């Protein structure tokens, strides 16, 4: 069954964040043949950052705004090894926040360049150190949070 959503797709959105979460639900048929029940999947790759992490980043930032811990002129700080960093950088950029990300040296050059292109300041930290080492991306993010006035440390891993 093909559903024509051209009218909805052509609707002007206030910004890219309004597209987060509006991902299609697809009925699975062939892959689940022989199983009882109905099976569906969400195409999270249809989010602007091509990941379900867009939902998470938007939710975290909006909750911080509601609680009053994040407002104009503030900086979002996080450790990341993947899509969460991109999503936080994107949401921060659109909402006007600064974004600082601490990443492992295992991160690809392309990923680091993409984070920079999204407006994030990226600190590349050695990957061959323990999590409690002051040079680890966990500790670097904590230190930056203590040094950067008006910052919020997301702390997704703990």
Model-derived features with residue positions:
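PLP-dependent amino-acid enzyme catalytic core
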Residues: 1-158
């Amino acid at each position: 069954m093909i559903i024509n959503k051209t009218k909805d797709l052509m609707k002007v959105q206030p910004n890219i964040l309004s597209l987060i979460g509006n991902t299609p639900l697809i009925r699975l048929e062939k892959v689940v043949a022989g199983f009882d029940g109905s099976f569906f999947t969400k195409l999270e790759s249809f989010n602007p950052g091509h990941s379900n992490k867009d939902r998470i980043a938007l939710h975290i930032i909006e909750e911080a705004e509601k609680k009053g811990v994040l407002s104009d002129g503030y900086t979002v700080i996080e450790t990341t090894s993947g899509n969460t960093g991109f999503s936080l950088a994107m949401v921060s950029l659109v909402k006007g926040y600064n974004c600082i990300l601490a990443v492992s040296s295992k991160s690809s050059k392309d990923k680091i360049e993409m984070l920079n292109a999204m407006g994030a300041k990226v600190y590349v930290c050695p990957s061959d150190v323990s999590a409690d080492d002051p040079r680890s991306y966990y500790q670097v993010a904590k230190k930056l949070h203590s040094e950067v006035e008006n910052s919020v440390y997301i702390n997704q891993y703990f």
